[in-house]
């Protein structure tokens, strides 16, 4: 079962969303949100931006110092109507990394972590199937490293 996720307190927000936020070309626009989920698995948050050119791009939002807070920034390069949305998703790699880091900090060695290392290799192997080029090779090298 995938736990429920929520996104709250999205900024910038003007008059509860009645009016668009305004800026000038070249201005750094901070965007933030509070995102949470049920359970202990890690959460990833992405900022999806649509430009006036009818193109779009995604930015991975960074965790802030406050609990459940995430930040990103964009710099508009053209006059026009820009829109954004924030998406939350389950992050199996971050969940795995957090668990393995705790086990290593507790003194467990490679032999104790054999199952965990194979789990990480499978997560990275699945990710490698979704990318090409040097990113794919980097992930496949990490898979080999975890399995050796």
Predicted regions span which residues?
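Extended acidic/polar, glycine-enriched regions
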Residues: 57, 62-148
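Catalytic cores of nucleotide-enabled group-transfer and carboxylate-activating enzymes in metabolic
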Residues: 5, 14-16, 23-77, 81-85
């Amino acid at each position: 079962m995938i736990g429920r996720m929520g996104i709250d307190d999205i900024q910038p927000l003007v008059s509860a969303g009645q009016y668009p936020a305004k800026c000038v070309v070249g201005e750094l626009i901070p965007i933030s949100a509070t995102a949470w989920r049920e359970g202990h698995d890690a959460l990833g948050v992405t900022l999806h931006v649509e430009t006036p050119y009818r193109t779009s791009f995604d930015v991975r939002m960074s965790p802030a110092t406050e609990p459940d807070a995430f930040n990103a920034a964009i710099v508009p390069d053209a006059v026009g109507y820009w829109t954004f949305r924030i998406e939350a998703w389950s992050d199996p790699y971050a969940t795995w990394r957090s668990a393995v880091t705790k086990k290593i900090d507790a003194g467990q060695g490679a032999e104790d972590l054999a199952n965990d290392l194979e789990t990480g290799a499978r997560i990275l192997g699945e990710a490698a199937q979704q990318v090409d080029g040097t990113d794919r090779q980097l992930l496949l090298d990490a898979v080999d490293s975890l399995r050796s």
